[in-house]
Regions:
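A polyanion-binding, active-site-adjacent surface
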Residues: 3, 11-160, 164-173, 178-183, ...
């Protein structure tokens, strides 16, 4: 399903009757609504960042809900799409704190390839309807992913922005890992 070590780690989930039933509901949502990201990008974060290579996890809430924005990575948008305010604020903090100049694109694919798992807690959303799939069942999978990452021997940095993401800290108990929390980067959260 993914094409890397996540397949074996998540096999127990993929093969469970509960997940199959849940994923059927997701497929029905795609048939009857405009849903983002495109279906072939739902698991893009896992495809681009293997379990073995994950060094940083940035937890988002759910995908952007505008046309052409979401492509399976939290806080990231496809090339050619204007940089969203949340990501502009992330870039501003990187510049202010570390002197890293802001990127000219909102596509964070390179971050993912370098070991930053850009994981939304909810992996799909209906067009123009934020949080529309929040109660659908994605969090069973994504919470399990966070618990698997907690088991890693190598230290992992978990970046939890906003109250929604901070709730995930309860799954991170390994003292080797670092949890960084702060308000959500959205200008509406300030």
């Amino acid at each position: 399903m993914i094409g890397n070590d996540w397949d074996e780690l998540l096999k127990i989930i993929w093969e469970s009757p509960g997940f199959k039933k849940f994923y059927h509901v997701v497929e029905e949502e795609y048939k009857h609504h405009t849903v983002f990201p495109p279906k072939d990008h739902i698991f893009e974060a896992l495809k681009l960042t293997s379990y073995k290579d994950t060094r940083v996890v940035i937890v988002g809430q759910d995908p952007y809900h505008g046309v052409g924005e979401a492509h399976g990575l939290s806080f990231s948008v496809q090339k050619g799409i204007p940089i969203p305010p949340s990501l502009q604020n992330i870039y501003k903090e990187l510049q202010d704190d570390l002197g890293i100049p802001p990127a000219h694109t909102g596509d964070l694919t390179n971050w993912a390839r370098e070991g930053v798992l850009m994981l939304n807690a909810v992996l799909t959303v209906i067009k123009d309807t934020p949080a529309s799939h929040r109660k659908l069942g994605w969090e069973r999978l994504t919470d399990y992913i966070i618990r698997l990452l907690n088991e890693k021997e190598e230290p992992v940095v978990f970046i939890l922005w906003g109250n929604f993401a901070k709730e995930k800290a309860k799954y991170i108990t390994n003292p080797k890992h670092l949890i960084l929390t702060s308000p959500h980067p959205s200008p509406f959260a300030a």
